[in-house]
Swiss-Prot record:
GO terms for cellular component: cytoplasm. GO terms for molecular function: electron-transferring-flavoprotein dehydrogenase activity; flavin adenine dinucleotide binding. Its cofactor is FAD. This is Apoptosis-inducing factor homolog B. InterPro entries: FAD/NAD-bd_sf (IPR036188), FAD/NAD-binding_dom (IPR023753). Signal peptide: none annotated. It comes from Dictyostelium discoideum (Social amoeba). The gene is aifB. Its EC number is 1.-.-.-. Belongs to the FAD-dependent oxidoreductase family. Putative FAD-dependent oxidoreductase.
Amino acid sequence: MTSEKKRVLIIGGGYGGCEVAKQLDSKFNVTVVERKQTFFHSVGSVRAVVEPELVKKIYIPYDKLLKNGKFIFGTVIEISPTLAKLEDGQELTFDYLVIATGSNSLAPFKAPLEKKSSSEILNYFQNFSQQIKQAKSILIVGGGAVACELVSEIVEKYPVKDSELVKKITIVHSGSKLVNPKMNDKFTNVVSKAMKKRNVEVILNDRITMPDEIKANLLNQTSPNIQISSQNYTTEKGVPIQADLIIWTVGIKTNSESYQSHFSNVINESGQLKVNLSCQVQGYNNVFAIGDCTDFDEFKTAYNAGYHAAIAAKAIDALSKGKSNDKLAKHKVSGPILSLSLGPQDGITQISPTMCLGSFATKMIKSKSLFIDRYISQLNNPKPLIQ
């Protein structure tokens, strides 16, 4: 007689949640709770806003991911050390819990939650693309990785012609250098030169104040109104900017609402869960956290979320076999490692504090495909949501 499989409950079906579910599916009774009906490959969103047909490939159905486990599509409103409560009243218990709630940023760089049908989703990206096409001047608020990748996609789609700018693009960034202050000088110089080559005006150490309606969009992960409207903006330091279109790439927020009540003693000031190197939430043997909602001092990337998932999956498997905590797999926290696409043919990848890979290597690693086919394969090649 075989023993009943242990129950693993995973809250969140993003990069980390999908990976840990897939790895544990054959050995455990796996349940994934996710508020979206499909996986959103956010890495590809920067290209989908200028090539909206790509939406058909970055919204990936979950139906082929698990052979044994199941998905529950709903919103978790409360997570405790013993159960998870859903908005519809369901209560789910577990033997092992994986919190993979991720983070919010503004659509279209995270899925706009109010766009539920395939036609709504496609129309949203088509409209976004049309507004970019029509705009003569674009203001990008924020100068992180998403902003630099987005600008590069726009310029690739609408390049300089006859020595005249098709579009004037301005980046306003609160930091002292683009992408992230932890990047080495070579990386930063390549990005700065790439923006200059693309005739992008970069304003550093300054801000555009975020309006209340944009803050509400961020809180609810809904889409800001994207519409051509010639406006005059002023930075906090008084720099005037005229733009037909404003795109916000700032405001990443940890999705902590569901767990903050019961885990308040192990949450940092950013709402992230404090974890050990086996991805266990501090003080809890059977509760794990992975991805953006962890307090690991490293970049919050799809790659790192997947790496955390592998660590957590190995740890859960080991615990189920009676192994002690000191025998569990351990995460090696990475330094500032990042692959940045600068359009389909260009980019730079920092692989250590002192070393970078150049344009050709980055093109092959990321820029050419933005990992789109990789994640379709990762979810076991389901039939596209949007035909």
